[in-house]
Amino acid sequence: KFENNMRAIRTLKTLEKEHRPASPEDQEVLSQYVGWGGIPQAFDERNAAWADENRELKYTLTPEEYEMARASTLNAHYTSPTVIRAIYSAVEQMGFHTGNILEPSCGVGNFFGLLPETMQNSRLYGVELDSITGRIAQYLYPQADIAVTGFEKTDRKDFFDLAIGNVPFGAYKVAD
């Protein structure tokens, strides 16, 4: 997971530096990013077994990106394709087929990537708080309008036909 994440981050930073869209090969690398929920030890400076990885993170990420990634180790667990398909199946059974779709905590955009054929004419909107993750989603799904910020800071209210996703659950306090 660590190496896939680092390859994706390096690819992201290259794309941004070169001001170009992601090629299919770039998107394949970006799609391997899984966040830091499964590997919090990479941020533990006292863990000698992960010292090299911690140094690489600090070298590659800005201080702000590093802190945001470290903070995400508690909640960056992406929804499995099986669960996403089941959610879409339920939505289709309720009669939804096209419209404005919001994913309020979109991660790298897995709900966009698994959008059923019957919903392909929909407009996609996402919000992602984590900077690296949101920027990867923007390159993976350039047709979607993805805001990289907290949902409470967006103007994305009273506009959607469907809000879908699996937002992190926890005792988080938000001031808006």
Which residues fall in each region the model found?
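Class I S-adenosyl-L-methionine-dependent methyltransferase catalytic core
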Residues: 1-176
